[in-house]
Each structure stands twice: as C-alpha cells, then as structure tokens.
C-alpha cells in the first residue's frame, strides 16, 4: 500500500507543534546569546527583573566523566618513545585506550563500559586527592622547619609587649618532652594571638581582653586536651603538664583541619569551575599560601576555613540536587556549617551572604517538567517523500532533541506550574529556619563566654589569684575578680534579650577598632604589608565582575543565584572584607583573613596560571601532577615567570610571604 504524502494542514500542525515545543526549551542563556553584543555589561534596571525566558541550564555538579582526554588536552596520557603533540589524534591514539580514558569505543552505553568509566573516574579522583595530600603535607613540613629555625635563632630577641602570659607561666623542667618538643621545637607556633588562644584553652575566659577571641577553636583544643589527659592517666597513670598537651592538641587540630580543608577546597573549586586542572592548582596554591603560618599556629584560621568550605560543599550540592527534600537536607546542613564559622571567628557573620544567596537559588528554582516529544513531526517525516523537506526538518529535529535532553531549571515565581502562595510559604519558613540555624551557635557562644566572665566560678577566681602570684599583672587588668566594678557591658541588658553585647566594646578598648581608628602614620608599614593581598583581591573582583557581566552577560540576579559556575557572591564578600580592612580593623590581618575566608583568591590565581600553561607547556598534563613528589609547590612554572612583571611579582609574593612571613611570625616580628 502506497504511503500518502501528508497534506499542508498536517505539515502545518506538525510544524506548529514543533515550534511550540522548541520555544519551551529556550533558556535565559539562549536569549543572552541572541541579544545585541552592545548590550553587555552591568545594567541596573534588568539586574532585578524576573528572567525571560524563566529557565536556565542546569549544568550539574561535575561531568559524568571529568577525566576524558577527548574533552581536554590536559588528560592526554604520557607518550613514551616519541614527542607529544597537542593534536586531537594524539589524544585519541593514547596507549591507555578507551577504558582508561573513560570513553567507550562503542556508541552504546552498556553496563560494562559504564562500570569501567566509573571505576576509572574513581581511581583518577583518588590520585588527584593523593596529589593534594602530598602538597598539603609537605607544605606543613616546610612550615614546621622554618618556624623552628626562626624561633630557635631569634629566641626572645624580638619579643614585644604583646600578650605572652602562656610562656611566662611555663615552669621549665616539668617535662623533658615538653621542654624539647614544645618549648623548643614548636615555639614558633605559639606567637602573637596564639598566646591568647592557648591561654583560653587552659584557663578559660578569666581576663576581659580574651573575650575578643571566639570560643570555637580554644574550646575544641581544650576538649582534645582533656581527652588526651584522661586517656593517658587511665592507661599510663600519668600525663603531661597542661601547657604541653594544649600546644600539641592545637597543632594536631590545625594539622587535621588543614589537610581536610585542602581536600574540600579541591571539591569546591571543581564544582565551581568544572576544571580538574584549576582545582589541583588551587590546592597547591593554598598549601603554600602567603598566610600559611596561621594555618599551623594556634590560630583559628584552619578551623574557620574548613567549616566554610564544608558549608560550600553541602549547599552547592543542595543547589544542584534532585528532589525537594534532598535539597532541603543539604541546604540546612550547609547552613549549620556556615553558622559554626560565626562561633569561630567574627568575620563568620559575612558568611550569611552565602547562606542567603544559595538558599535563593535553591528555593526559587526547581526542576523543569519533562518536555514531550514532537510526535506529529515524527509521523510527518516518516510519511513524507519530499527529501528536501525531510532533510531540513530532520536537522531541526536533531537540534531540538539535543536541547530537550538538557537539564533545565524553571523560576518558580513566574512559572504557571508552581503556586506563588506555596512558593512564598516555603521561602518564609526556610528563611526563618536558616536564620535561626545560622545564628544559634553564635548566640550560644556569646552567652556562654559572657556568663563565664561576668558570673565566674570560684575556680576561675582562684586561677586569677594563682597567676597573680606567679606573674605581676598590670593594675589595669580586668579579670573575673573585678568584672562588675571595671566593666559596663556586664550590666547591660542583652540584645533582643538573648545576645550578650561585649565584642565591639572590647575591640575598641584594647585594639582601637573603629572607623579610621587605624589610620596613623606609624601604621603605614602595616598597610604596606596588606597591599599585595589587597591588589590581588581587587584584580580578582574585577575579573569576576567582567566574567559575569561582560563575557557571560548574565545580567540577572535570579539567574546568578541558580548557577554555581561563577564567583560573584565571593567577589561581593571579598569587597566587604577589603573595605573593613582598610577603614575599620587592623589592616595587617587582611592577608590571613582573605586567604582563609573563601576560595575566591585561589580560584583567581589558579585560573591565571591555567591560561598561561596551555598546549604542551609543563603543567598542562595530569600525569605531571601525579608524578610530582609534592615536596615543592607544583604551581611554579617557567611560563608564568616569563609572563613579565605580573608572573614574577606573583611568585615573589606567594613564596616570599610563605618563607619570610613564616619566619618573621615565629621570631615575634610583626607578621600577624
């Protein structure tokens, strides 16, 4: 039976169905590509408007196989016996074959090839984490060596009038192990603010100035110390003096947090950049960063950055998750992690920006309903004998199928499939819940420390008397014995009836923290010390701004909250930190704050190095990372050094601060 040629009405109906379905696949990114190129850049009227179309492409957390040599020359296998070329043929002729490159020779995705790809991906991921671990571990060994050399030869030659009560209370001869390891080997890790944290961990908050240092880190160190002491007493019947176990506990906690932090940084950067190379470079830069000494000293930077990155991992996976309850679980877990940062450092308050930003993307965007297939067009193409018509529409149909398979999200507020009342209710409930989860650790911490100081136990008063017998205290010292007589904030009512108000008053009283309070002639060297970090931050902010508004042209705040492949919220966060560092707080602390607050600087530097090391240049092959022993920083490439003054200054800054900053801090010189 001969097939009848479809009539014009049938073809028109099929074409109308196709056009309607194709329109439903349009996304905001497609509309941006069709805009006038002259319209690029930041435009305030459109930044807050609802996106049109109200869909965005869901790129997924990572590729199914991020180690495929067909996607990037970076994954080309090492060629033995002949010179490597950067052509596609060299990548496809890799001796590893399809199994090792994760690509199946067959077009069918059978279970066996899928299992091989998963196995290969997991093995490569483990090797990447192994590279990260080597870089992180050996960088700590260098820090320990440098701090020992500096503290041993400098001794107390450069000791200032800063707080050093922990060292004064040490009684030499109590422990040979303590004298050798702690007083000699690790003395460089007990300088400057480390004295404050170690004192709090041992004696709690018995002096007023100690309340400027949040309890998250010293309380953790104290718990570890108590556990070690109890364990040693139960097993051996004896233990080390408190000053020995507290120092060892602080070093152990920071070493553990630093290693975990580097591994988590790899995952966060991979989610944001979809680049294994940039992720590995970011970890290598982090391992030898200019503020590296503060991640090993008895400071709270390592713990703070670990919790921050953990919050990023959970919330970004929640943003990219499938299913409502899965997204809620990840989002609330990430919120708790970000909230804990506020109990560790005061700048954890700014992490609420990330919580609000990512929750907007999680709640206001949802998975798109499946788009049906073009059944009328399929039947029409099967029946038509017009080859020209068939070829034309088959090409359109193929492009439609490619777009139809994309994962997309829709903006719930303007999509007719979602109720605005339900969306508003969910947003309000989650906003209240997330706010409570974020601020609860801080409220608990402030009330705990304030009550410990203003309503002291007899043991704390006794500790002050014991210290006063050993060390002469200044008459201006405010302790738990005279808290009510010499302080005003102890008598003030709590903010909202639940938050103790003391932090700002103590910072102003002891460190002159106020607007323009640090702008003095004698503080110019401190501003010069922060200058390289400030310049890097400004360049990173500019790069992020241009990437979003000039290159990608995503001039819509709602679309930006739905996507994780940009760093605009980190740029805003870093802008606030830079402003506060210049006009408000002690400027010299900006270096360690910016390098321990977000992955922003690491992503910027790693991206810069990535662009310079393309082709067959050293550093653009994954096997080179795997074969690196890790004892030296891997991100140092000749090509970057040859990039004029920028590359040279970058390396001089990072490695100079890593070496000389570590030694200066350990010798009591003003690198704080």
Curated annotation (Swiss-Prot):
Known pathway: Glycolipid biosynthesis; glycosylphosphatidylinositol-anchor biosynthesis
Basic and acidic residues biased stretches: 82-94
Region feature Disordered, mapped onto this chain: 82-115
Gene Ontology BP, a term: GPI anchor biosynthetic process
Enzyme class: transferase
GO molecular function: alpha-1,6-mannosyltransferase activity; glycolipid mannosyltransferase activity; mannosyltransferase activity
Tissues expressed in: Expressed in epithelial tissues including the epidermis, pharynx, intestine, rectum and excretory cell during embryogenesis.
Intervals, Cytoplasmic compartment: 1-134, 261-277, 367-423, 542-569, 614-648
Subcellular location: Endoplasmic reticulum membrane
Transmembrane feature ranges: 135-155, 240-260, 278-298, 299-319, 346-366, 424-444, 521-541, 570-590, 593-613, 649-669
Positions on the Extracellular side per record topology: 156-239, 320-345, 445-520, 591-592, 670-672
UniProt keyword terms in alphabetical order: Endoplasmic reticulum, Glycosyltransferase, GPI-anchor biosynthesis, Membrane, Transferase, Transmembrane, Transmembrane helix
Ranges of compositional bias, category Low complexity: 97-107
Keyword Magnesium annotated: no
Enzyme Commission number(s) of this protein: 2.4.1.-
Membrane topology according to the record: Multi-pass membrane protein
Result after altering residue 361 to E: In qm34; temperature sensitive mutant resulting in elongation arrest and over 80% embryonic lethality at 25 degrees Celsius due to epithelial defects during elongation with cysts forming inside the embryo and/or cells leaking out from the embryo body
This protein's GO CC annotations: endoplasmic reticulum membrane; mannosyltransferase complex
Function: Alpha-1,6-mannosyltransferase involved in glycosylphosphatidylinositol-anchor biosynthesis. Transfers the second mannose to the glycosylphosphatidylinositol during GPI precursor assembly. Required for maintenance of epithelial integrity during embryogenesis.
Protein family (similarity comment): Belongs to the PIGV family.
Protein name: GPI mannosyltransferase pigv-1
Record organism: Caenorhabditis elegans
